[in-house]
């Protein structure tokens, strides 16, 4: 697995959908590949473009669209019981029935995704997503401004939350799987990358 600092050209970083498309340019000659990278926007709207932290299964290659500033290969050696600092930008949501009673193609009432607004609900969502892999010891969720996107004839917004805190490892292989797969929805919109560091 690779961790990279990347700058996406301004023309490709106007919204999250474009940014995601720009990141694909770092992995040429893979037109049919499934997405095997996660990212976290660190700085937007700088003169050179958008600064991104990228986690990927393949080593990224600089292009005219995206420049790789720094890359390092990462191998996790996690131990049960060890506390770690963590950071996660996520899209904590719940699914509810459409209050306007609109129907889907099967005649069932549509389900809608809505953001979790209350801090206690956000923390409970995070612990559910971590499952038995880790226990949250301390966390500070910070609700961010809505993120807007458009592409493929669709547009929308997501409500992101930045979680920062301390967790304790319960199941090292399960936690590594979560790091590699990402946590929660909207991974193509810059959510789900779980960063870990020693205390």
Curated annotation (Swiss-Prot):
Annotated GO molecular function terms are:
RNA binding; RNA endonuclease activity
Pfam families cross-referenced by the UniProt entry: CRISPR_assoc
Q: Which CDD domains match?
A: Cas6_I-E (cd09664)
Q: Which GO terms describe its cellular component?
A: protein-containing complex
The UniProt entry's GO biological process terms, in alphabetical order, are: CRISPR-cas system; defense response to virus; RNA processing
Cofactor, how bound (note): Does not require a metal cofactor.
Q: What is its EC number?
A: 3.1.-.-
- Phenotype of gene-disrupted mutants: Loss of resistance to bacteriophage lambda infection, loss of plasmid silencing. Decreased levels of crRNA, increased levels of pre-crRNA, prevents pre-crRNA cleavage.
Q: Which keywords describe this protein according to UniProt?
A: Antiviral defense, Endonuclease, Hydrolase, Nuclease, RNA-binding
Induction data: Repressed by H-NS, activated by LeuO. Activated by the BaeSR two-component regulatory system, possibly due to envelope stress. Part of the casABCDE-ygbT-ygbF operon.
Matches recorded under InterPro entries: CRISPR-assoc_prot_Cse3
For this protein, the record's SUPFAM superfamilies field holds: CRISPR-associated protein
Oligomer status and interactors? Part of the Cascade ribonucleoprotein complex, with stoichiometry CasA(1),CasB(2),CasC(6),CasD(1),CasE(1)-crRNA(1). Interacts directly with crRNA, CasA, CasB and CasC. Stable subcomplexes of CasBCDE-crRNA and CasCDE-crRNA also form, both of which are able to bind target dsDNA, and CasCDE is able to form R-loops. CasCDE and CasCE complexes have endonuclease activity. Interacts with YgbT (Cas1). Binding of target ssRNA or dsDNA causes a conformational change in the Cascade complex.
> What's the family?
Belongs to the CRISPR-associated protein Cas6/Cse3/CasE family. Subtype I-E/Ecoli subfamily.
Q: What does this protein do?
A: CRISPR (clustered regularly interspaced short palindromic repeat), is an adaptive immune system that provides protection against mobile genetic elements (viruses, transposable elements and conjugative plasmids). CRISPR clusters contain sequences complementary to antecedent mobile elements and target invading nucleic acids. CRISPR clusters are transcribed and processed into CRISPR RNA (crRNA). CasE is required to process the pre-crRNA into single repeat-spacer units, with an 8-nt 5'-repeat DNA tag that may help other proteins recognize the crRNA. This subunit alone will cleave pre-crRNA, as will CasCDE or CasCE; cleavage does not require divalent metals or ATP. CasCDE alone is also able to form R-loops. Partially inhibits the cleavage of Holliday junctions by YgbT (Cas1). Yields a 5'-hydroxy group and a 2',3'-cyclic phosphate terminus.
Q: Please give the name of this protein.
A: CRISPR system Cascade subunit CasE
Source organism per entry reads: Escherichia coli (strain K12)
């Amino acid at each position: 697995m690779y961790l990279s600092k990347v700058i996406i050209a301004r023309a490709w970083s106007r919204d999250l959908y474009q940014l995601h498309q720009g990141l694909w340019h770092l992995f040429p000659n893979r037109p049919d590949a499934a997405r095997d990278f996660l990212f976290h926007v660190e700085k937007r709207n700088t003169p050179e473009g958008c600064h991104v932290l990228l986690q990927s299964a393949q080593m990224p290659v600089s292009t005219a669209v995206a420049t790789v500033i720094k890359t390092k290969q990462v191998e996790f050696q996690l131990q049960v019981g060890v506390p770690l600092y963590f950071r996660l930008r996520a899209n904590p949501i719940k699914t509810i029935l459409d209050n306007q009673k609109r129907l889907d193609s099967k005649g069932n009432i549509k389900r809608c995704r809505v953001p979790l607004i209350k801090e206690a609900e956000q923390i409970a969502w995070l612990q559910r997503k971590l499952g038995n892999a880790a226990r949250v010891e301390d966390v500070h969720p910070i609700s961010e401004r809505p993120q807007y996107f458009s592409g493929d004839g669709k547009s929308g917004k997501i409500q992101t939350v930045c979680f920062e805190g301390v967790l304790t490892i319960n199941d090292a292989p399960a936690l590594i799987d979560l790091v590699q797969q990402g946590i929660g929805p909207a991974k193509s919109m810059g959510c789900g990358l779980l960063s870990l560091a020693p205390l």
